[in-house]
Amino acid sequence: MKVIFTQDVKGKGKKGEVKEVPVGYANNFLLKKNYAVEATPGNLKQLELQKKRAKQERQQEIEDAKALKETLSNIEVEVSAKTGEGGKLFGSVSTKQIAEALKTQHDIKIDKRKMDLPNGIHSLGYTNVPVKLDKEVEGTIRVHTVEQ
């Protein structure tokens, strides 16, 4: 019997997959527990529509990420920090501070965990901070660190 998996079933199939399984297994386990539906022409057509919609949504996410990358390349974020002698910072500028400054100055919300800045910024001046906007799209934020 051909079934369409509605959930991942370990060792048997993943969600959205169409597979041939024994009739007893399908009727007594998969269909009964709503892990799968029978692969009728109507259900197959519905599956194709869902896959097409998911692909369009994914494409839209990529387009949005590319637009955000373009926006980020044209702006600069200014972050102020306390400094000591010789322009050395007390502590460092973190991704949290950069995300907050980006939100207040340009009304752009980016999760601090998407910024690749493992040790923070330890000096005054300009720094380019890489940002993972999507699995396929990566941009940079230009951060200007100034004295407080």
Swiss-Prot record:
Keyword RNA-binding: yes
PANTHER family reported for this sequence: 50S RIBOSOMAL PROTEIN L9
GO biological process, one term: translation
Protein name (database record): Large ribosomal subunit protein bL9
Record-linked Pfam families: Ribosomal_L9_C, Ribosomal_L9_N
Residue pairs linked by disulfide bridges in the UniProt entry: none
A Gene Ontology molecular function term of the record: rRNA binding
SUPFAM superfamilies assigned: L9 N-domain-like (SSF55658), Ribosomal protein L9 C-domain (SSF55653)
Keywords: Ribonucleoprotein, Ribosomal protein, RNA-binding, rRNA-binding
Cross-referenced Gene3D superfamilies: Ribosomal protein L9, C-terminal domain (3.10.430.100), Ribosomal protein L9, N-terminal domain (3.40.5.10)
Taxonomic lineage of the native organism: Bacteria, Bacillati, Bacillota, Bacilli, Bacillales
Superkingdom of the organism of origin: Bacteria
rRNA-binding found in the keyword field: yes
Role description: Binds to the 23S rRNA.
